[in-house]
From Swiss-Prot:
Residues 129-168, 237-274, 386-417, 494-540, 1717-1737 are annotated as: Disordered. It comes from Scheffersomyces stipitis (strain ATCC 58785 / CBS 6054 / NBRC 10063 / NRRL Y-11545) (Yeast). Pfam families: ATG2_CAD. Its main location: membrane. Residues 494-507 have a biased composition (Polar residues). The keyword RNA-binding does not apply. Keywords: Autophagy, Endoplasmic reticulum, Lipid transport, Membrane, Protein transport, Transport. Residues 132-146, 254-274, 1725-1737 have a biased composition (Acidic residues). GO terms for biological process: autophagosome assembly; autophagy of mitochondrion; glycophagy; lipid transport; piecemeal microautophagy of the nucleus; protein transport; reticulophagy. Belongs to the ATG2 family. The keyword Cytoplasm does not apply. It is found in: Preautophagosomal structure membrane; Endoplasmic reticulum membrane. GO terms for molecular function: phosphatidylinositol-3-phosphate binding; protein-membrane adaptor activity. This is Autophagy-related protein 2.
Length: 1848
């Protein structure tokens, strides 16, 4: 214990020393000396001299003033502890300081040893004075006080530290005495104000009282009433009672501006040079400068007012002081020692913080420090550069310094075993998020506020190795309407424990602990031990604090580990609503902004530390090599329960299982998160379960896929796999969601409503960062200042000083890693399962499974992928797949992700790019029956999509948001509701863009390479496994190059390709703001009606390839893809009436008296005709208006009505190929069975005839034919006396057309190989699809326009009583051109149907067919509708061959009972109108069905006559009241039948071939007389009239005579060719070219080449047999040649021989054309043979009238050429005869050869003569009438000629 006395001498010397220190103040005048005595000195209004104070650490003193300073000495017993001492009492202290970041070593050492220097000076003074005059101490002290100005503190320090003389014993004693004297020094400071000024921030600190003294050798510092206020920037103080934001008045604003102007120079020059360094001034100058600079430094009471009155809080008015950010009621500090402080104890009372003004203040401080450090570093770098230049002669001394390093200095200090820190205790910390803070520490607005409360916080240090502590209570409380509730708290202990806690007792050291004793220290433990400890149920666990932690230092060899463990052992409860979420979100936003600015500051400090001197760096490097420091942080929590009340009806609770974090492992893990929902206060249910969450904060590599850029050579780019490294990685094992659809909609709607309210109210909160700075001053400088305060880090692109790059780019961890493959964050989810329970009552549920989900952020973009996903419908345990991978591969076999996502954000646009690959979406018609609730709410859904969509704010239109979908090899499966068939639409590639505009929402899509696949029965698919089973087994090992396309996959399953298209564009426009769009259209002059939804489809080229059975299946499938329309009788018609109806009231008695009316007629006009006309007029007035609905529609002004929906379809080119044969196995089996049955019946008949078991009469009564009819179109019949081969040959001839192999294109050969050669059929029956098509329809410019005017359902929606009728929709179909080509082998004609070119070229824009349908509802209350149809047709030219007609009838009449559907609601045609139709017909019969004639089929008589140019003109027809299309055909027949009989017989008979020329010549004679008469009546010129008539007569007569000659010559040629062929010659085959195609009717311009088909090929002979190596082959230009796929599998027989020994994929893609190998028949197959094994010797017939010359010159050339060709044939025959004669051995052989060749030798020149004559006559006739050549090209097939490139 210190002695309780002090010698008088020491007291005097102490007072002398204190008086000497008064030189720190400016010169003291007499007015300042209020009282001076020996033991008491009182000074008033004195200023502190900044120059005498000198350099302070980290700051500069700008101004200092003490209101009252009293110094006195006291005798023992008057102060604490007894004994004498010195009291220093300062009141009203005001200090202004500015930060200085240029902290030199000299300043730091000076401050460190300042107290030791003062002690040494005092000791010297005592020793010196005691030796000279010890007896006169008091007098000498009074008279000899001479204060010499010190040169500098550094010199004193140097002299003190540099003294090497050995101290005397008296000196040590006196130093001890000085220590004793200083221990009796008591300092008391009252009402101290410290203002911290900087360039961006001004702060004011106020302290009510500071008391410093020593008690029992312990230094005690007591601080009372500490508060901090922000002067600059002008921040929002927070909410007051009335929530009025304070604003400065004009007078105070001018004062503040004056203050800012006073400091403007200092702020501008602050970064470069301080005021103390740049000026040398006297005390008077300094005083004047600082007084002027600080005259208004401290705020006045009138600086802040609210409006014109005062806002009261309770009974006290709100202080008009600056915004307070901090208040502390008291702080007690105790420590031992002076130069070496130890055993530090801090006890703090209550701390209150207002975050509303605090956040912008801290941000401003951090930005200011960062800026100052950068400027100082730039100055230091410049000085070092100059210093290096000055020491260039002695570079080894450039960085030399004599100063001691930190380690050396610390080694010289005496070691102190006592720890520096002992404990810290804070009673309460209260942080308010919204309320303002008053001067006295009371929150100005406690209502509607959220406070963070930390109660009883303790930190203790047990020894140098362990620091522990905790927070007893942590909670977040909300004050609302005077009621305080906890929104965050920890679980409360038991009641008994709570009673114990309420009786807290102080510990032995005076610090109160809640549990009566300090918490035990936490030992270093693993997370598992912490978890077990927290989960224990002992009583001690309930007494633990809410938060506990320990810091443990562990030494192991050269490694120092500092381990920090934090434990939250209680369950946390968090409850949020809209108000609390708003406040907390703004609070978190402010904290994040502070953290971001702090990170920038730390990065700047780190860069500064790297620029230290090399010597210091070397010293630290050596120390680092000797000792390594590691940091470990472990966090363990208990479960956290968070509840969010979105609305009154929705409560969401999240249960977060214990959280564990390990810093060394960089891993945070959560075992599970449960999210429960409570809807409408009902039972709580678990909705979301998240399992195994792991967060890694270290580098981790992973694989990802990136999208390749598509190019024309690679239509389906395979994504590229890359390696990516992420610094943060989040792993989630599984996310499972279980919720009903209604609940999901309810939850989403409530969350959206919550979000909208949150977004609209967030910026309006007083504690938001945007409202934290009050920008009342509108000048530019303040705006820039405030924007710089709140500017988030990283946005400033200005670089200040060298070496200050972004801290993220300078991370040494990323060295040697490509920045292109670095991701900042990665999220990997193994599986996500969403179970939508009870989507609809009848529908069941949907299950969505996503597997291997990857999301990562790279270069501010978000990339991601989903490896696999599927959607399944679940109903009563049954699964129905909806969306899935088309091959249904297991997860480990999938090599490419099904979905890839790329999100790119820029300043103007945000784009989300989604790539979907190999996804199959199933459409089920049955689902439409299950979606009753969806259909019931269809109108509401339309309103939600269109009408309820709010227009986008124009201001936000700059930040556009687009979504783009790209699809590759995606499939749409079409499943009809009642049929077993199925179809797939395969999309090769496509894109779809979603654009959100201001007034409209757009969807623009483009799809390419779309193909359609079809199968008749899905059971057939299931029975057909893949050919190569090894493919699926080894798929995992295959690279991405072995990609299987959907076309290949489904073709192997038995599907056939029925068509496709190359490109289709789809555009959908949703008009969300109709009014604005209408205004825009008015300005642009657009008068069309608007629609809510506008759909446009534009497609380029299409093709369909169908057989009769596949066509029937396709049509029935399309019909079954919609719900059947069946209405009840009371819905279609009014079956009951409200009142009785008297039919007699509607009868008009004068109805039949109209004919007897006397009508006056004009003179000279016959009465009968006038009467008839009048009667017709009267009758017409009684009839209803035929155009009533169309006129009503036309009355609607354009642009004044908004339609619900519009559809526009435009198809550029469409080709339909009709094939003979059958695609389906069941059809072929049925035909084969019928053939067997017919043959069996025929066999029985032959047996009966041979055994003569039947009578002759009975046999005659039986039918001549044995026949059977299948599918309503296939007639299998055989004469009773015929053989099996006759039936088989006839079927094969009709189906396969008996084509030679040389007549097919390579494409047709490939299809024939696939369809025919791979299978065997009964008795050589060729029932598969024919090798070539029989009919091809070519349509161009098909346009369909649909306008929907009403979607109202009278059964559900109300009906307007005043509505007389209701227009439903308009449908308009236009067909530009139509050409139907005849490709039947036995037909010689080209076009079956085309435009009549002889009537002149069609008008531009005129459609060949136009169909307009208007659907109306006559009674708006009934659901039934009626159709009004109008048809317009251009003149049509028909060339009908009987074989072609039979094929069409057989094709179109095909019906399979397996695909029959009940009839839907039959369309009622109210009115049908067709315009006049002009027909010109050519008909060529081949045979006559006499059986049909005998059965009464009168139409069969047409087959007796050949028609050539018969004309039929059908007048306009209008019919009414038709039920269905069959009734329409019957009605038209009744209308046109009498007209044809009365007026068109002459035109038909004029086309009879025998009399055609006579009729035409007769027409010429008529023209010879009729034309001159008409012309003469017209102009009166006789000669010209006769000339015109003569020319017409000569032209007609001449052409007909020449045409007659051509027919005679051609007939003669045909007879001669047939005779030659009978005698062994070539016949008509000589006219055919050696190599030609058979497909000219497609476009009449394509080039074909000869080919041969491969049946079974030896792979070893592939190259040797290739025609590519033998001769040139013309390339097939058919654009569909490579797109036609058919099944490679024969499903008819079980013993099919498949092609082996060759890669089938190579064969299908090869350009080689191989020869046939006929030896492919298996042994033992006597009754079955290959389809291709039959002899096919038939030819495609070519007419002699084809390839007609256009003029006489060309005719002569062709005549010469044809005659030469025939002479060449004769020459060749003569050469052959000569060779045979030379080879003959006897005269008989010679005569035989001569007799065989002579007819051919003599006939062939005659054939050449007739052919030459016909060609010459054709050329002459076509030159006379050039229109005939146009007709001939449309009518006849063309073969290739040597002159041009026309081909068949």
């Amino acid at each position: 214990m210190s002695p309780q006395w002090m010698p008088q001498n020491i007291q005097k010397r102490l007072l002398l020393y204190v008086l000497q220190q008064l030189s720190l103040f400016s010169e003291i005048d007499l007015p300042n000396l209020e009282e001076v005595s020996l033991n008491n000195i009182v000074l008033r209004d004195i200023s502190i001299d900044p120059e005498k104070v000198g350099k302070l650490p980290g700051c500069n003193l700008r101004f200092g003033q003490v209101g009252t300073l009293e110094l006195n000495t006291v005798t023992g017993g008057t102060i604490i502890g007894g004994g004498g001492g010195v009291n220093v009492d300062a009141r009203d202290v005001e200090v202004v300081i500015s930060p200085d970041f240029d902290i030199n070593e000299e300043v730091r050492k000076e401050v460190q040893f300042s107290l030791a220097q003062s002690t040494a000076d005092l000791a010297k003074t005592i020793i010196k004075d005691s030796d000279s005059a010890a007896e006169d101490e008091s007098d000498d002290t009074d008279e000899e006080i001479v204060v010499e100005p010190k040169k500098s503190r550094s010199s004193s320090s140097s002299s003190f530290s540099g003294s090497t003389s050995k101290p005397s014993a008296l000196s040590a004693v006196m130093s001890r005495a000085v220590e004793m004297a200083l221990s009796r020094l008591q300092i008391k400071i009252t009402n101290m104000k410290i203002k911290l000024v900087s360039e961006m921030t001004d702060l004011l600190f106020e302290v009510d009282e500071v008391l410093i003294n020593t008690v029992n050798g312990t230094r005690v510092v007591k601080i009372t009433g500490v508060r901090s206020m922000t002067l600059k920037p002008n921040v929002n103080p927070g909410e007051l009672v009335e929530k009025v934001v304070q604003s400065p008045q004009k007078d105070d604003t001018s004062d503040n501006e004056e203050d800012d102007s006073n400091y403007e120079d200092d702020n501008n020059d602050y970064g470069d040079e301080s005021l103390m360094d740049s000026m040398v001034f006297t005390h008077e100058e300094a005083s004047s400068i600082y007084l002027s600079a600080t005259s208004q430094s401290f705020p006045r009471p009138t600086s802040y007012n609210v409006d014109e009155g005062e806002v009261h809080v309770g009974n006290e008015s709100v202080s008009s002081d600056p915004p307070a950010i901090f208040h502390m009621d008291y702080c007690d500090v105790e420590f031992d020692g002076l130069s070496n402080v130890s055993n530090l104890k801090i006890d703090i009372g209550t701390i209150k913080v207002a975050t509303t003004p605090l956040a912008p203040t801290i941000i401003s401080i951090l930005n200011g420090i960062t800026r100052s450090l950068k400027i100082k570093n730039h100055q230091k770098w410049t000085q070092q550069a100059l210093k290096r230049q000055q020491n260039s002669r002695f570079p080894q001394y450039a960085e030399t310094t004599d100063e001691l390093t930190d380690d050396e200095a610390s080694s010289k200090d005496g070691e102190n075993t006592d720890p520096f820190f002992n404990k810290l205790h804070i009673r309460d910390i209260i942080i308010s998020t919204t309320s303002a803070l008053s001067r006295d520490g009371v929150f100005a607005s406690p209502d509607n506020s959220i406070n963070f409360v930390l109660h009883n916080s303790n930190i203790k240090q047990k020894n140098d190795m362990l620091i522990y502590g905790g927070v007893e209570t942590f909670r977040i409380e909300q004050v609302k309407e005077g009621v305080t509730t906890d929104i965050f708290t920890f679980e409360s202990p038991t009641a008994a424990t709570h009673a114990e806690q309420s009786q807290s007792q102080p510990d032995s050291e005076g610090v109160s602990f809640a549990h009566g004793s300090p918490p035990p220290p936490i030992r270093p433990m693993s997370p598992s031990s912490i978890s077990s400890m927290s989960s224990s149920g002992s009583k001690s666990s309930t007494l633990k604090a809410d938060l506990r932690f320990e810091i443990f230092k562990k030494l192991e060899e050269n490694v120092v580990t500092i381990e920090t463990t934090a434990l939250l052992s209680k369950t946390a409860l968090l409850t949020l609503d809209l108000n609390s979420s708003l406040i907390l979100s703004n609070f978190i936003t402010a904290m994040n902004s502070i953290h971001s600015n702090f990170k920038v500051l730390m990065a700047t400090i780190e860069n500064l530390s790297k620029q230290q001197s090399p010597k210091k760096q070397k010293t630290h490097t050596n120390a680092a090599e000797a000792m390594t420091t590691k940091t470990q942080f472990i966090l363990q929590t208990s479960p956290i329960i968070m509840s969010v009340k979105f609305t009154q009806d929705l409560l969401v609770k999240a249960i977060i299982f214990p959280i564990s974090y390990n810093l060394q492992q960089n891993q945070l893990s959560i075992s599970k998160i449960l999210i429960n929902t409570t809807i409408r206060n009902e039972r709580e249910s678990t909705t979301i379960t998240i399992s195994n969450i792991v967060l890694l904060t270290k580098l981790h590599e992973f694989k990802s896929f990136i999208k390749r850029i598509a190019n024309p050579s690679n239509a389906n780019p395979i994504p590229r796999e890359v390696q990516v490294t992420a610094s943060s990685n989040l792993f989630i094992s599984k996310i499972m969601v279980n919720i009903a659809l209604k609940e999901l909609k309810f939850v989403i709607s409530n969350i959206v409503s919550f979000y909208d309210s949150f977004a609209s109210l967030s910026a309006k909160q007083s504690n938001s960062l945007e409202n934290s700075v009050l920008d009342f001053v509108r000048d530019r400088s303040h705006k820039l200042e405030i924007s710089s305060i709140l500017q988030p880090p990283g946005q400033s692109r200005r670089r200040i000083g060298p070496g200050f790059a972004s801290p993220h780019l300078s991370n040494p961890t990323f060295v040697n890693i490509s920045r292109n493959n670095i991701a900042s964050f990665r999220c990997s989810i193994k599986e996500v399962e969403l179970n939508l329970v009870q989507v609809l009552p009848k529908f069941g549920g949907l299950t969505l499974r996503l597997k291997d989900i990857l999301l990562y952020e790279q270069k501010n973009d978000i990339n991601g992928s989903i490896l696999s996903f599927d959607i399944v419908r679940v109903d009563d345990g049954q699964l129905q797949k909806f969306v899935y991978e088309f091959q249904e591969l297991p997860l480990e076999s999938i090599r490419l992700p099904l979905i890839m996502i790329h999100c790119k954000n820029t300043e103007k646009i945000s784009t989300v790019d989604v790539v979907i690959r190999n996804v199959l979406v199933e459409y089920y018609t049955q689902w439409l029956l299950l979606l009753d609730d969806f259909e019931a709410n269809e109108e509401k859904l339309a309103e939600l999509v269109v009408e309820k969509v709010k227009p986008v704010n124009p201001s936000s239109s700059q930040n556009r948001f687009d979504i783009r979908f790209s699809v590759f090899d995606c499939i749409i499966g079409l499943n009809p509701g009642r049929l077993p068939c199925k179809s797939y639409l395969v999309v090769g590639r496509g894109t779809s863009d979603f654009t959100f505009g201001v007034n409209q929402f757009y969807i623009k899509s483009s799809f390419r390479d779309v193909s359609a696949l079809l199968i008749d029965d899905v059971k057939n698919k299931e029975k057909m496994p893949l050919k190569d089973n090894s493919t699926s087994r080894s798929r995992k090992s295959l690279p991405t190059s072995s990609y299987t396309s959907p076309l290949t996959f489904f073709s192997n399953l038995g599907y056939i390709m029925i068509g496709g298209l190359n490109v289709v564009h789809i555009g959908i426009t949703f008009n969300t703001n109709i009014e604005e769009v209408m205004k825009r259209n008015e300005k642009l002059g657009i008068s069309d009606n608007l629609s809510l939804i506008d759909l446009k489809i534009n497609s380029d080229e299409h093709h369909l390839e169908l057989c009769a059975d596949s066509t029937h299946v396709l049509l029935q499938l399309i019909n079954d893809l919609k719900l059947p329309l069946n209405f009840k009788d009371d819905e279609k018609m009014k079956v009951t009436v409200d009142s009785s109806i008297n039919l007699m009231d509607d009868l008009d008695e004068n109805q039949f008296q109209l004919k007897k009316r006397n009508i006056s007629v004009a003179p000279g006009v016959e009465t009968s005709s006038s009467s008839a006309g009048s009667e017709n007029e009267n009758l017409e007035t009684i009839a209803f208006d035929e155009d009533h609905f169309s006129k009503a529609r036309n009355k609607i002004p354009k642009g004044s009505k908004v339609d619900p929906f519009k559809l526009n379809i435009n198809l550029s080119k469409t080709k339909i190929y009709l094939y003979d044969g059958y695609d389906w196995k069941d059809t072929r089996k049925a035909v084969r069975g019928a053939v067997k049955r017919v043959e069996a019946q025929a066999m029985k008949e032959r047996l009966k005839k041979l055994k003569k078991q039947t009578d002759k009469d009975d046999y005659d009564e039986e039918d001549e034919f044995i026949e059977e009819t299948l599918f309503s179109s296939i007639h299998v019949g055989i004469p009773r006396d015929a053989t099996d081969a006759n039936l088989t040959d006839r079927i094969n001839k009709r189906v396969q057309s008996s084509l030679q192999e040389t007549d097919m294109t390579p494409e047709e050969a490939q299809k024939a190989q696939i369809n025919v050669e791979l299978g065997k059929n009964y008795k050589n029956l060729k029932l598969r699809r024919s090798r070539v098509h029989k009919i091809m329809a070519d349509f161009t410019n098909i346009e369909v326009n649909v306008s929907v005017y009403s979607t109202r359902d009278p059964r559900k929606d109300p009906t307007d009583e005043n509505l007389p009728y209701e227009l439903l929709n308009d449908v308009e179909v236009r067909l530009g051109t139509a050409d139907v080509y005849d490709n039947v082998a036995t037909s010689t004609w080209n076009k079956l149907l085309t435009y009549m070119n002889t009537s002149g070229e069609g008008e531009i824009g005129k459609s060949m067919l136009k169909l307009a349908i208007t659907n109306v509802r006559p009674s708006p209350k009934l659901v039934s509708s009626e159709a009004i149809m109008k048809v317009q047709v251009l003149p049509v030219r028909l060339h009908i061959d009987q074989d072609t007609l039979d094929f069409l009838m057989r094709f179109l009449e095909f019906k399979d009972s397996r695909f029959s559907l009940p009839l839907d609601e039959i369309v009622y045609i109210q009115k049908f109108q067709i315009s006049p139709v002009m027909l010109k017909l050519d008909y060529k019969p081949k045979r006559v069905d006499y059986v049909g004639i005998r059965s009464g089929n009168s139409a069969e008589f047409m087959n007796f006559f050949i028609l050539d140019g018969s004309t039929i003109n059908l007048a306009e027809a209008t019919v009414y009241g038709l039920l269905g299309m069959p009734s329409l055909g019957k009605a038209l027949g009744e209308v046109w039948g009498p007209q044809i009989q009365q007026t068109q017989i002459a035109g038909i008979l004029a086309g009879l071939a025998p009399i055609r020329s006579i009729v035409n010549i007769g027409g010429g004679v008529k023209d010879l007389i009729a034309i001159p008469i008409s012309e003469y009546k017209k102009d009166g010129r006789l000669f010209r009239s006769i000339q015109k008539g003569t020319q017409k007569f000569a032209k007609t007569t001449g052409y007909e005579i020449l045409n007659l000659g051509v027919k005679l010559a051609s007939g003669t040629q045909v007879i001669l060719e047939q005779g030659e062929q009978l005698l062994g010659g070539e016949g008509s085959g000589a006219r055919l070219p050696a190599s030609r195609g058979s497909n000219s009717q497609k476009c009449n311009v394509n080039k074909r080449s000869s080919y041969k088909v491969a049946a079974k090929v030896d792979f070893n002979k592939l190259l040797a047999n290739s025609q590519v190596l033998n001769q040139s082959v013309r390339v097939d230009r058919d654009q569909y040649a490579n797109k036609k796929f058919y099944s490679y599998i024969d499903i008819d027989e079980d013993d099919d021989e498949l092609v082996t020994g060759i890669d089938k994929e190579l064969l299908s893609k090869s350009i080689f054309l191989l020869p046939r190998d006929d030896n492919s028949k298996k042994e033992g197959e006597e009754d079955e043979a290959d389809d291709s094994s039959a002899d096919e010797e038939g030819e495609k017939l070519i007419s002699l009238y084809s390839n007609q010359p256009e003029n006489i010159q060309e005719g002569m050339k062709l005549a010469y050429k044809s005659f030469g060709n025939n002479l060449k044939i004769t020459k060749r025959q003569l050469i052959n005869l000569k060779n045979e004669l030379n080879e003959s051995e006897n005269i008989q052989d010679s005569l035989k050869s001569i007799l065989k060749s002579s007819p051919i030798i003599f006939i062939r020149p005659i054939i050449g003569s007739t052919e030459a004559l016909s060609k010459a006559l054709m050329g002459l006739g076509n030159e006379i009438d050039s229109k005939r050549i146009v007709e001939s090209r449309d009518k006849y097939r063309y073969i290739k000629r040597a002159k041009d490139e026309d081909v068949l």
